[in-house]
Amino acid sequence: ELQFIGALLYNKLFWILFGVITLIYGYKKFNFNIVKETKSKRKQVQKLVAKSAHVNSDIEIPKAKKQYGLQYKWTQLKEFSWFYFISICKQPSFWGIVICGMIIIIVNSVNLGTVYGVDSYPTTYFIVEELQETSYFFFIIILVFYSGELVWKERGAKLNLIYDATAMSSFVRLAGKFIGLNLIYVVLIVALISSGIVFQTISGYYNYEFQVYFNGFFLEILPVLSIFTCLAFFIQSLVNNKFVGIILVIVFSIVNVAIAVLGFDHDLHFFGGSSLGAYSDMNGYGHFLQPYLIIKLYWFLFGILLLIIGSLISVRGNETNLIKRIKIAKYKFSKPLLKFTDIILFTFIIIGGFIFYNTNILNEYWSNSEATEFRVAYEKELKQFEYITQPKIVDVNLQLELYPSKRDYKVEGYYMLKNTSIENIKAIHIQKLLEENVTIDSISFEGGFTRNNQYKKFDYSIFNLKNALQPCDSVKMYFKQSFTTKGFEQGNSNSNIVYNGTFFNNEQFPTLGYNKKYELQDEDERREHNLSKRSRKANIDDPKELVNARSGGDSDGIHFEMIIGTSKDQTALVPGDLLRKWTDNNRNYFHYKTTTPIINFYAIVSADYEIKKDKWMTNNKGITEPVDLEIYYQKGHKYNIDRMMRSMKASLDYYSNNFSRYQYQQLRIMEFPRYATFAQSFPGTIPFSESIGFVLDIDDEKDVDMAFYVTAHEVAHQWFAMQVEA
């Protein structure tokens, strides 16, 4: 139990006292007046009278030239945008918010990519994420508060009637306030970027990556702020009450997040759209950036429409009744504004249609309820096949063509299936990966077969063999499969197959029999749909489960061979000895083959790598044999490569002496993008996230050497999983 004593108690008391004092001081000193009165009214009047006595009443006032064209409106927009920007900068309340925000950022300090208490080097993407996280709510405070202040600025100063009588478009007025507030965001963003660069410099890190700063703030934070600012101005214009408007903006923001959690998260109706996602040194923003920008443009155009509507129904003059303001709105709709609105509306509809075409036609969109119903139906209809006797995969021989720039692949080859049971097998059940981009182009079996497509909606096929498979007999299953990327999907789609740093495993390929991973997982939802409770662990002597006890349930161990092709700048890696490497048709090819059986669980990795190589010597019955040690890493991520290499050697020494001989001729570590934050062991290969060890800033005197530790942990799995189960 955590006890509030000692330093923890004093810390909490200090900040509570600080907060109370700040609140009292702010309450006493805060002033909503636009102009601070530094002199008494009597002195101001005396000064004005004294000045007027020296004024020449015969001064000739020049004639004003009347202009009402677009150039005139553009000039107004620029001047008023600058005016409102400066007016906010001059307000003490604004700098009070900024100073409080900076204090909290400093107090929270900077924890960058912490892994078990070990910070990472101050890479730009870590700095950007930290600044985004700590400053986001202060941006929201400024947005909510100053959108109300700007809409009510003239009425707060009681100059609204004079202001409303000017020959100025209501839209230009509101747009000027909108741009002025966005300029405030830009200034704060520049300040945050500058502080990030200063922090990197002080920390001795000089790879600033300005494009990452730009993307993180000007493509991610600023568009969201602009879209919500449009909404805030619309609400303030609609309700005609500053404080009610502020509350409604806050309530809307909360509800918007809540409905997304409840499943209404499609980018076409989730206000503002989804976030950009993580940046990776290996893959940048990858394929996520283009759809993100399209969706943000869609919502920005919607925000402009809200701004136009807000300007039309805004209070101008003495009329405050909403119904009457709506009736008056048509008289404010000038021809230039109407044309501008038509262009915005037309573009908004076209982009919305384009998004719908990509997310709902080219790709399939499932709501949470639809996905749940599918899982329920899958289990109710196919559960009968869970323990049906099936052959085991004993050989895998594949040729994979990977196209990183298109995010596609094509694979063909065969599985050798062996009947390891004592029963005749008349039908083989095949489950395709339930992903729309994956297509099984063909499947065939030696000796002839017929296909039962009764469960096609689940991508589950039953192949009735012409000749039943006798115990200990084998049959080859030939197949061709492709993964084809079509447009863009809803949300941050597939992060396994990317431009640089592809990492997926053999779950992509056809599997045998019923697959429990497609069952409904949540126990409450299972009860609602009358499904039995799932058992986390089977009894140790359960004969049905013992048949499929290994990690690859459809295999007891395989001989593996693959030829894999990838783009010319990349290296493709899978388990096994590298028999041959060559280039053909401007593509790199690699031929791998295992010399000992492995579990049916292997990874495919491809990226543009730097390589560090070494050797470790193993003793096999008195004969010394070399094991190739290789670390494939992103250029610039060499900070902890030596630690990882030492860990590989030390781990192999210890485990070989205390467990058994290491069974492969190589051990490879391959870095993959930080879309996931783990390392995972496969036979002879260890895919390793760039965020979990490669950029850790390890202090040998005070930190746990996490790069060494994680590597040692994963190497241990080469025995406890890879060797035990193979």
Feature annotation, model-predicted:
Residues 109-113, 121-138, 175-240, 279-281, ...:
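Secretory targeting signals
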Residues 366-369, 481-556, 614-616:
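Glycine/proline-rich low-complexity spacer/linker segments in large multi-domain proteins
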Residues 424, 435-500, 548-549:
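A surface-exposed beta-strand-loop module
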Residues 148-184:
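Helix-loop-helix units of permease transmembrane domains in multi-pass membrane transporters
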Residues 72, 76, 80-83, 92-112, ...:
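Hydrophobic helix-coil surface modules that form long, contiguous segments used
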Residues 1-29, 36-37, 242-328, 359-364:
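Terminal transmembrane helical anchor/hairpin motif
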Residues 336-408, 525-537, 547-554:
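N-terminal, polar/Ser/Thr-rich
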Residues 16, 23-147, 151-155, 309-376, ...:
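Hydrophobic alpha-helical transmembrane segments
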